[in-house]
Amino acid sequence: MARRLSKELGEKGHVIVSGLARGVDTAAHAAALKTGTIAAMASGVDVIYPAENTVLGEEIGRDGGLRISEAPMGMSPQARHFPQRNRIISGLSRAVVVVEAAARSGSLITARTALDQGRDPPATHLRPTCA
Protein backbone atom coordinates (compact mmCIF):
# COMPACT_ATOMS: atom_id res chain seq x y z
CA MET A 1 0.00 0.00 0.00
CA ALA A 2 2.81 2.47 0.87
CA ARG A 3 4.56 1.88 -2.46
CA ARG A 4 1.42 2.34 -4.49
CA LEU A 5 0.26 5.40 -2.58
CA SER A 6 3.69 7.08 -2.73
CA LYS A 7 4.03 6.40 -6.45
CA GLU A 8 0.55 7.74 -7.21
CA LEU A 9 0.97 10.85 -5.04
CA GLY A 10 4.39 11.51 -6.57
CA GLU A 11 2.97 11.25 -10.08
CA LYS A 12 0.41 13.90 -9.08
CA GLY A 13 3.19 16.29 -8.06
CA HIS A 14 3.43 15.64 -4.33
CA VAL A 15 6.78 15.16 -2.60
CA ILE A 16 6.93 12.22 -0.20
CA VAL A 17 8.38 12.98 3.24
CA SER A 18 9.33 10.12 5.53
CA GLY A 19 11.95 9.00 8.04
CA LEU A 20 14.13 6.51 6.10
CA ALA A 21 13.21 3.81 8.63
CA ARG A 22 12.62 0.14 7.86
CA GLY A 23 9.37 -1.02 6.32
CA VAL A 24 6.80 1.54 5.23
CA ASP A 25 9.34 4.41 5.16
CA THR A 26 11.66 2.39 2.92
CA ALA A 27 8.81 1.49 0.56
CA ALA A 28 7.56 5.10 0.40
CA HIS A 29 10.99 6.60 -0.34
CA ALA A 30 11.86 3.93 -2.93
CA ALA A 31 8.57 4.47 -4.78
CA ALA A 32 9.12 8.24 -4.86
CA LEU A 33 12.76 8.35 -5.99
CA LYS A 34 11.79 9.51 -9.50
CA THR A 35 9.13 12.00 -8.39
CA GLY A 36 10.62 13.52 -5.24
CA THR A 37 11.25 12.42 -1.69
CA ILE A 38 12.62 13.96 1.49
CA ALA A 39 14.22 11.81 4.18
CA ALA A 40 14.04 13.44 7.61
CA MET A 41 16.74 11.77 9.66
CA ALA A 42 17.35 11.17 13.37
CA SER A 43 21.10 11.15 12.72
CA GLY A 44 23.42 13.54 10.94
CA VAL A 45 22.69 13.56 7.20
CA ASP A 46 25.96 11.71 6.60
CA VAL A 47 25.02 8.82 8.93
CA ILE A 48 22.35 6.77 7.21
CA TYR A 49 20.28 4.74 9.65
CA PRO A 50 19.37 1.95 9.55
CA ALA A 51 22.49 0.73 7.74
CA GLU A 52 20.36 -1.49 5.50
CA ASN A 53 19.00 1.72 3.91
CA THR A 54 22.45 3.07 3.00
CA VAL A 55 21.97 2.55 -0.74
CA LEU A 56 18.47 4.07 -0.65
CA GLY A 57 19.73 7.06 1.37
CA GLU A 58 22.55 7.61 -1.12
CA GLU A 59 20.08 7.39 -4.02
CA ILE A 60 17.85 9.98 -2.37
CA GLY A 61 20.79 12.38 -2.05
CA ARG A 62 22.10 11.69 -5.55
CA ASP A 63 18.86 11.60 -7.53
CA GLY A 64 17.37 14.96 -6.59
CA GLY A 65 15.81 14.03 -3.27
CA LEU A 66 16.81 15.55 0.02
CA ARG A 67 18.16 14.24 3.33
CA ILE A 68 17.62 16.65 6.22
CA SER A 69 18.29 16.60 9.95
CA GLU A 70 18.64 18.83 12.99
CA ALA A 71 21.48 16.59 14.23
CA PRO A 72 25.05 17.65 13.43
CA MET A 73 27.12 15.83 10.82
CA GLY A 74 28.62 12.63 12.14
CA MET A 75 26.05 12.12 14.91
CA SER A 76 24.55 8.67 15.27
CA PRO A 77 20.83 8.50 15.99
CA GLN A 78 19.76 8.66 19.61
CA ALA A 79 16.32 7.80 20.99
CA ARG A 80 15.53 11.46 21.74
CA HIS A 81 16.13 12.42 18.10
CA PHE A 82 13.28 10.32 16.69
CA PRO A 83 10.39 12.46 18.03
CA GLN A 84 12.27 15.53 16.71
CA ARG A 85 12.56 13.83 13.32
CA ASN A 86 8.83 13.07 13.38
CA ARG A 87 8.06 16.73 14.12
CA ILE A 88 10.09 17.69 11.03
CA ILE A 89 8.23 15.15 8.90
CA SER A 90 4.90 16.56 10.03
CA GLY A 91 6.02 20.16 9.68
CA LEU A 92 7.10 19.65 6.07
CA SER A 93 3.93 17.82 5.12
CA ARG A 94 0.63 19.14 3.86
CA ALA A 95 -0.96 15.90 5.07
CA VAL A 96 0.28 12.98 7.15
CA VAL A 97 -0.83 9.54 6.00
CA VAL A 98 -0.26 6.64 8.40
CA VAL A 99 -0.24 3.41 6.40
CA GLU A 100 0.63 1.12 9.29
CA ALA A 101 1.51 1.75 12.93
CA ALA A 102 2.11 -0.15 16.13
CA ALA A 103 0.50 1.20 19.30
CA ARG A 104 3.77 2.87 20.39
CA SER A 105 5.21 3.99 17.08
CA GLY A 106 6.85 6.98 15.51
CA SER A 107 4.05 7.05 12.96
CA LEU A 108 1.52 7.81 15.66
CA ILE A 109 3.82 10.46 17.15
CA THR A 110 3.94 12.06 13.69
CA ALA A 111 0.14 11.91 13.38
CA ARG A 112 -0.28 13.46 16.85
CA THR A 113 2.18 16.20 15.92
CA ALA A 114 0.20 16.88 12.75
CA LEU A 115 -2.93 17.31 14.86
CA ASP A 116 -1.04 19.64 17.20
CA GLN A 117 0.05 21.64 14.14
CA GLY A 118 -3.56 22.02 13.02
CA ARG A 119 -3.72 19.31 10.37
CA ASP A 120 -6.14 16.39 10.36
CA PRO A 121 -4.39 13.23 9.18
CA PRO A 122 -6.40 11.37 6.55
CA ALA A 123 -7.73 8.10 7.93
CA THR A 124 -8.60 4.83 6.29
CA HIS A 125 -9.99 1.63 7.65
CA LEU A 126 -8.46 -0.41 4.85
CA ARG A 127 -6.02 -3.07 6.01
CA PRO A 128 -2.74 -2.81 4.15
CA THR A 129 -1.47 -6.19 3.05
CA CYS A 130 2.11 -5.13 2.47
CA ALA A 131 4.34 -2.06 2.50
Spans of model-derived segments:
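Glycine-biased, small-residue-rich flexible motifs in mid-sequence functional cores and linkers
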Residues: M1-A131
